[in-house]
């Protein structure tokens, strides 16, 4: 197992998203000197979320990151998170505001009030729980094809062979 891991690590070290030269060998005996340091790493800024109407994509041919709008399909190369933060600072310094800014207390109180109003009746609570279960992905294993899958919580059959899946979240879930 250690040999396989070591082999994969060496192979991945020789990969470059921007350099079009590819190594068909196993990666042994190659030096990293031919790959510039800037080509080895790609900053995704994944610790900040992308606005909900955009999708962050990677062009595998060029190695460039671009953003695609789900509404219009337009591609933008500039990171919208950076332009939004610059725009907000500019608006605040000029005294203008492009939208309503809520404090974290206001947002949390809004969500708490939404939860309490939607959970007022038992039928709405049951519907709300079923709706939440549809959106949750869980790990499930198939005993027949010996594979693991990420499937919606309410999904019971293996997507490959249609036998019953073994859900690994059942230890933590409460059943009625």
From Swiss-Prot:
Residues 48-82 form the WW domain. One of its GO terms (molecular function) is ATP binding. A motif (EAR) lies at residues 41-46. Residues 93-106 have a biased composition (Low complexity). Keywords: ATP-binding, Helicase, Hydrolase, Nucleotide-binding. InterPro entries: WWC/KIBRA_Hippo_Reg. Residues 77-106, 111-130 are annotated as: Disordered. It comes from the Eukaryota. May negatively regulate the cuticle development by interacting with the HD-ZIP IV transcription factor HDG1. May interact with BHLH122/CFLAP1 and BHLH80/CFLAP2. This is Protein CURLY FLAG LEAF 2. It comes from Arabidopsis thaliana.
